[in-house]
Regions:
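N-terminal presequence-like segments and the immediate start of the first folded domain
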Residues: 1-81, 89-107
Length: 107
């Protein structure tokens, strides 16, 4: 599956997309956007099933990669150290790792 990079999204709050310290770049939390540029929302287990949520997490990963591409440049990145994924889900939804794999599978 090919990756279609997006424009770097403008922060919704009082933060920046990238903060540098030494040789490390920290990417702020990112969301997922649909093809029209709208933020995708919903609760897994209620509004989205696991497969839909996997694809939303993949879009988050593409947003992160787009921030790296547009704000840093891939040539400056040697290694991704950590991806932190949070899943907004119902209390009975128990396969959060499957959802986060949508993002992790890109790295």
């Amino acid at each position: 599956m090919s990756i279609k990079f997006i424009s770097t999204p403008n922060p919704i709050g009082n933060f920046v997309n990238v903060r540098f310290t030494g040789n490390y770049a920290y990417i702020s939390g990112q969301g997922a956007f649909d093809d029209e540029g709208n933020l995708i929302t919903g609760k897994v287990g209620k509004d989205l099933d696991a497969d839909q949520a996997y694809n939303v997490a993949r879009r988050v990963g593409i947003t992160i990669l787009s921030v790296i591409k547009n704000d840093i440049g891939f040539e400056k990145v040697k290694k991704i150290v950590k991806i932190l994924g949070l899943v907004n889900c119902t209390v009975d939804f128990l396969t959060q790792p499957k959802v986060i794999n949508g993002c992790s599978d890109l790295f």
